[in-house]
């Protein structure tokens, strides 16, 4: 038997690399069948069968001790069991799914709504110039943890977070304040394997679903490896990034843990411009395969509507004066457009009876204020409604003295009808009677 046949693909390359005089072989990126056979044996029979297959294939040990424990801990049985198997007409066993393959359409869970695809006009990240900035943990002037916290605190509309581990209570407080105090909708995707750490933190802080009115917490896994027997295990989420207002991205090695902010060395990238589209697409794909955990289960996409806060703080930037006038509060203040346009002022007589105010529309929820991140559009103050223009200028007047209209220059709004006090005034002045009749000379 040729000795080279007893060597697996990886073992052969290692032996050639150790031999200085061996001929350099061409790089091979093809599929390794020995690795698949060994992994299937690990799922079906355990470590002993795994080592046996490696020995038969002449391959090196592919997995570390931690990787072996991870696979053994996360093995999932196939969707069917022996109890559900029935014997067919030809004596072969058949399961209820008619196939050993996994059919997502047979799932009992509700499907995640199809995510909206951006149009060229709606992509907010295309409005900014493409740039990239790097932050290192050793740079004390631009601390990585503080950079992330500033990003959360400066977000004004929506925040999308994909994280492997979330146990930092201070960052979690920033997220809660953004959602509950500033009405920012937060999409939080967490790794399913470390989700229990996040739930434990919420239990310690006594945070429940009722405190997450604007937060959607969902779990997601990595890719799934499935053996021929149907047993499988899922990978972890090692991607970590934050999308703020769909305009820039923070990504790197940083995890939302206390150790990452204090002792672990990490780096952080900040991207803006066209590259944000890649992160947006990745987040939407992961969101579609995620499962609800806490907070809102399935936020319905609604058109964005601006809302005036009770504290007077707008959800937009303080430099935008249009954000204080909304369609939900048409009587909150006079719009700028209606003041500058004199042609829309009412010419009908002003009534002295109180004008009943129409019932204001209910306060819009954050789901109505901020669309699902898949259907984002720029928040622009809606134009003033013409139906309300007359109500803006109807005032309740008290009877004015007769001298008011002679000493005040603002009586051009006065009605042409005679008011009651006008009849008590003389129609003609005595000083002008000499011009009432023509004189003959």
Swiss-Prot record:
- Signal peptide stretch: none
Q: Which domain of life is it from?
A: Eukaryota
Coiled-coil annotated residue ranges, if any: none
UniProt lists compositionally biased (Low complexity) regions at: 328-354
Q: What is its main location?
A: cytoplasm
The region called Disordered is annotated at 81-108, 312-368
Q: Which GO terms describe its biological process?
A: cell population proliferation; epidermal growth factor receptor signaling pathway
The entry's keywords: Cytoplasm
Location of this chain's protein in the cell: Cytoplasm
User: Quick check: keyword NAD in the entry?
Assistant: no
Q: Which cellular component, as a GO term, is one annotated location?
A: cytoplasm
Output compositional bias ranges, type Polar residues.
314-327
| UniProt-listed InterPro entries | FAM83, SACK1
Q: What family does the database annotate?
A: Belongs to the FAM83 family.
In Swiss-Prot or TrEMBL terms, this protein is called Protein FAM83A
């Amino acid at each position: 038997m040729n000795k080279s046949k007893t060597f697996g693909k990886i073992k052969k390359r290692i032996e050639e690399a150790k031999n200085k005089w061996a001929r350099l072989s061409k790089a091979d990126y093809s599929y390794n069948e020995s690795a698949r056979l060994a992994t299937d044996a690990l799922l079906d029979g355990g470590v002993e069968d795994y080592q046996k297959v490696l020995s038969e294939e002449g391959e090196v040990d592919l997995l570390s001790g931690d990787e072996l424990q991870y696979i053994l801990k996360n093995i999932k049985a196939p969707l069917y069991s022996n109890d559900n198997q029935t014997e067919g007409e030809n004596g072969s066993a058949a399961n209820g799914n008619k196939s050993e393959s996994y059919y997502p359409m047979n799932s009992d869970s509700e499907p995640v709504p199809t995510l909206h695809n951006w149009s060229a006009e709606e992509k907010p990240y295309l409005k900014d110039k493409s740039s990239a900035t790097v932050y290192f943990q050793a740079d004390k002037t631009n601390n990585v943890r503080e950079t992330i916290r500033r990003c959360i605190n400066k977000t004004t509309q929506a925040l999308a977070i994909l994280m492997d581990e979330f146990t930092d209570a201070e960052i979690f407080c920033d997220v809660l304040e953004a959602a509950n105090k500033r009405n920012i909708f937060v999409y939080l995707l967490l790794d399913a394997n470390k989700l229990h750490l996040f739930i434990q933190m919420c239990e310690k802080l006594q945070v429940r679903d009722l405190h997450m009115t604007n937060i959607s917490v969902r779990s997601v896994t990595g890719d799934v490896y499935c053996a021929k027997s149907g047993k499988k295990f899922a990978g972890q989420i090692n991607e970590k990034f934050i999308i703020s207002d769909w305009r820039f991205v923070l990504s790197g090695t940083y995890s939302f843990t206390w150790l990452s902010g204090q002792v672990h060395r990490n780096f952080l990238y900040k991207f803006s411009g066209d590259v944000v589209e890649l992160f947006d697409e990745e987040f939407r794909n992961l969101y579609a395969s995620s499962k609800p955990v806490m907070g809102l289960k399935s936020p319905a996409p609604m058109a964005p509507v601006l809302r005036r806060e009770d504290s007077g703080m707008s959800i937009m930037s303080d430099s935008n004066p249009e954000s204080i006038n909304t369609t939900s509060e048409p009587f909150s203040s006079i719009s700028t457009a209606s003041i500058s346009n004199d042609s829309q002022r009412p010419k009908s007589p002003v009534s002295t009876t109180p004008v009943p105010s129409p019932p204001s529309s209910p306060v819009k929820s954050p789901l109505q204020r901020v669309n699902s991140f898949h259907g984002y559009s720029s928040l622009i103050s809606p134009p003033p409604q013409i139906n309300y223009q007359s109500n803006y200028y109807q005032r309740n007047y008290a009877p004015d003295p007769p001298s008011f209209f002679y000493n005040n220059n603002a009586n051009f709004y006065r009605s042409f009808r005679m008011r009651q006090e006008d009849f008590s005034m003389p129609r003609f002045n005595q000083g002008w009677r000499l011009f009432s009749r023509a004189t003959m000379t």
